[in-house]
Amino acid sequence: RRGFFLSFFPSDTPHYENVLPDGWCLTDIGELLINRDGERKPVSSVIRSKQTSKIYDYYGAAGVIDKVDSYLFDERLLLIGEDGANLLSRNKNNAFFAEGRYWVNNHAHVLDATDKNLLDFIAIVINSMKLDDYITGSAQPKLSQDNLNKIPIVLPPLAEQQRIIAEIKKWFTLIDQIEQGKADLQTTIELTKSKILDLAIHGKLIPQDPNDEPAIELLKRINP
């Protein structure tokens, strides 16, 4: 999937201005989005363990990590991991959405936009990128707010953003179907193997020959 992302967004940042299609522009996260990190609050595991209702998602750097009794946000916003190994490994998307009522701790940046349609496109761009140049620390990788704001965004017109998103979703649906087909095939293979073994050990895999020596006779020879 990342290769598909990268086909839309080349990584040669210094030359963006020379290759931009008509109507596109070069900007960055800081200029384009509204940072709402000041509204997030961490809740310690000790406090969370004492809560009883626990009906709202509690987000960390890579997604939901717990449930809590209350919420900070009640709208769809874009979250981007602030720290943790996933920033470099990208085993999960570094940009993801939170919806409904939820709480965000201080390990995920909270981003909003004057036109929330922008957020879907930005999520695609961020998840297509290697963020190494904007991350500090090796033992504990961190994407600071300052560095997050510097990430360049090649921005098409809003209508074209929507067409790009629709095209990506179409291809991802096809990819998911292929992956599911492979998973279903693997499941079928495993079930078939199990069934063959089950038939074999119950004497039903092949026709039995009444002239075969009984197994009890074999056992007597092995263990007189």
For every predicted segment, state its role:
Residues 1-6, 42-48, 64-69, 94-99:
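Intrinsically disordered, low-complexity boundary segments flanking structured domains
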Residues 18-23, 46-51, 68-72, 100-102, ...:
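A general structural signal for short secondary-structure junctions and capping/turn motifs
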Residues 60-127, 136-139, 143-148:
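A short beta-sheet element
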